[in-house]
Regions:
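PPIase-associated folding chaperone regions across multiple families
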Residues: 29-31, 134-209, 215-216, 232, ...
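Bacterial N-terminal signal peptides that target proteins for export
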Residues: 2-12
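Solvent-exposed coil/turn segments that connect beta secondary-structure elements
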Residues: 41, 48, 53, 188-193, ...
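Second-shell loop/turn segments in exported
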Residues: 33-38, 79-94, 103-113, 143-148, ...
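C-terminal motif of bacterial Sec signal peptides marking the signal peptidase cleavage site
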Residues: 21-24
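N-terminal targeting/tethering segments
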Residues: 27-142
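Peptidyl-prolyl cis-trans isomerase
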Residues: 212-254, 289
Length: 365
């Protein structure tokens, strides 16, 4: 069976949306079909497809190359738990879309609504997208005015609700709860790397010599010498690290040994690992800057926990149903999307935003 890959350059001047190039053999879909229900509210396939294609374009444009693959091949990769990468991403997209609707349904509880200016901006954005793109392009991504407007309404409400849903958490954090210590450590590696990046493991004799160097450093630093100076003399580098008992990097045994030290200036024993040897010196029992940053992190964690808890509560109180047969019509493998910009796509910007279509042939059994 033969098919053609359609290319449609999609242009938008709105920052919330992305310019896209769509490729594939996707046919028209019923954008009014119900892909899911959240409480009493239906999610249309048009809104779901537009949101999915926007996200798909980001993955294919920015991540496929980093993963050393093509957009097509990326979606068929195994994501574990008997899922392809496409299955996994689509599951996340559907959950995120449901969350948008849940948040919108509770916006009135927080006195959140769209302003006249926001509604006007959304309408203008949808109209501009509609005017700038061909029917072929809009068909591929469901880029129609009603679907774009609904999508932008949802993301705008979600943005305005974000802070509201995080308000009211306890922002008091004690030094004891957030305490961060500081150390300097030296890592004596059992491998060397040449200028070409090739690694070579030391011989047993060389490892013994390295262990002697590590012990010399530990002894001299314990006697009062500066760890950075001694490390440099031995051809090594002393690294700075702030940590607490829950830290795991660069090595859990090093963290545990340093955390057990009672006084600033104390030195750990040699921490031997499969890859080398660590020696650490405690430099501060309470690093002020790191502790204050940890306090901010703890407060932000509390805000996030409250946000997640609210969403979970709303989910539990709401009937949610996904119509899989409809959702399956959104297929990433056969229909690709690539983010483009007007600066790099002359065809898209010619004539005030017209879009171009072309065809690349492909075959499938």
């Amino acid at each position: 069976m033969m098919y053609f890959r359609r290319k449609a350059a999609v242009l938008t001047a709105v920052g919330a949306l992305a310019a896209m190039t769509a490729t594939g053999c996707s046919g028209s879909i019923d954008t009014d079909a119900v892909v899911a229900t959240v409480g009493e509210e239906d999610i249309s396939l048009g809104v779901a497809n537009f949101y999915a294609r926007m996200t798909q374009g980001q993955y294919e444009t920015y991540y496929a190359g980093m993963m050393g693959t093509t957009g097509e091949a990326m979606w068929t990769q195994d994501a574990g738990e008997d899922q392809t990468y496409e299955d996994s991403v689509k599951d996340g997209l559907m959950e995120s879309l449901q969350n948008m609707y849940l948040i919108s349904q509770h916006a009135a509880d927080y006195d959140v609504s769209l302003t006249d200016d926001e509604e006007k901006a959304i309408a203008e954005a949808a109209e501009q997208f509609d005017a700038d793109n061909t029917d072929t392009a809009k068909e591929t991504v469901s880029g129609y005015k009603k679907d774009i407007e609904k999508y932008l309404e949802l993301v705008t409400i979600q943005s305005k609700m974000d802070g509201k849903m995080r308000e009211g958490v306890d922002e008091e954090v004690s030094d004891e709860e957030a305490a961060q210590k500081a150390m300097k450590y030296v890592y004596f590696s059992y491998t060397t790397t040449d200028d070409s990046g090739n690694s070579t493991e030391l011989t047993d004799e060389e490892k013994d010599e390295l262990k002697s160097d590590a012990q010399e450093l530990a002894d001299r630093v314990a006697a009062g010498e500066d760890i950075s100076t001694v490390a440099e003399e031995l051809g090594q580098t002393a690294n700075d690290l702030t940590f607490d008992s829950e830290s795991t990097s660069p090595n859990e045994d090093l963290i545990a040994a340093a955390d057990a030290l009672e006084s600033e200036g104390d030195v750990t024993d040699l921490i031997e690992t499969d890859g080398g040897i660590y020696v650490g010196q405690l430099t501060s029992l309470l690093d002020r800057d790191a502790t204050d940053q940890k306090k901010e992190s703890i407060v932000e964690e509390r805000r996030q926990e409250q946000y997640d808890s609210l969403l979970e509560e709303w989910r539990n109180d709401t009937d949610i149903e996904v119509h899989e047969r409809v959702w399956n019509k959104v297929d990433f493998e056969d229909t690709g999307v690539t983010i483009i910009t007007s600066e790099t796509d002359e065809t898209a910007t010619d004539g005030g935003g017209s879009s171009d279509t072309s065809e690349d042939s492909g075959a499938a059994e």
